Curated annotation (Swiss-Prot):
Essential for the production of a quorum sensing system signal molecule, the autoinducing peptide (AIP). This quorum sensing system is responsible for the regulation of the expression of virulence factor genes. Involved in the proteolytic processing of AgrD, the precursor of AIP. This is Accessory gene regulator protein B. InterPro entries: AgrB. Keywords: Cell membrane, Hydrolase, Membrane, Protease, Quorum sensing, Transmembrane, Transmembrane helix, Virulence. It comes from Staphylococcus aureus (strain bovine RF122 / ET3-1). GO terms for cellular component: plasma membrane. The chain crosses the membrane at residues 49-69, 82-102, 106-126, 144-164, 166-186.
Amino acid sequence: MNYFDNKIDQFATYLQKRNNLDHIQFLQVRLGMQIIVGNFLKILVTYSISIFLSVFLYTLVTHLSYMLIRYNAHGAHAKSSILCYIQSILIFVFVPYFLINIDINFTYLLALSIIGLISVVIYAPAATKKQPIPIKLVKRKKYVSIIMYLLVMILSLIIHPFYAQFMLLGILVESITLLPIFFPKED
């Protein structure tokens, strides 16, 4: 166990005793804290590297666009925490880093984003085993995903093309995570 896990266990035990939580509630509290700390550390590492490479703003634009769609569309997750770190750094830091030095035609990115929209229309929301989506929310999440995707695309036509490419990158990455190839076949 590392330092953070020990502190999480100590605090979860304290909350269990103080609030008279049963073992299941204790495990839920501990898991919630582990997720919060893990996500905070991933964000800290990713954005620290982006600051070091002077691409913080581009990372932020890409990540925010991605999250606007991801919140309702869901999608595939990395198989492990370390893979999540690697994927986050590659997608949200290094791709924008290289994108600022490569002249990619905006029309090409827009065309790819339209293909991504098709992915969102067909596959969103994409549930996982660990994060199933209640049936009553599926239709609403699909509509919101499509609307948010279209809004980001429209906004990308209005703002400066340099920043728009990072917005399109974010939504394109999210649309890729919805594809069935990233979900294992269920038995």
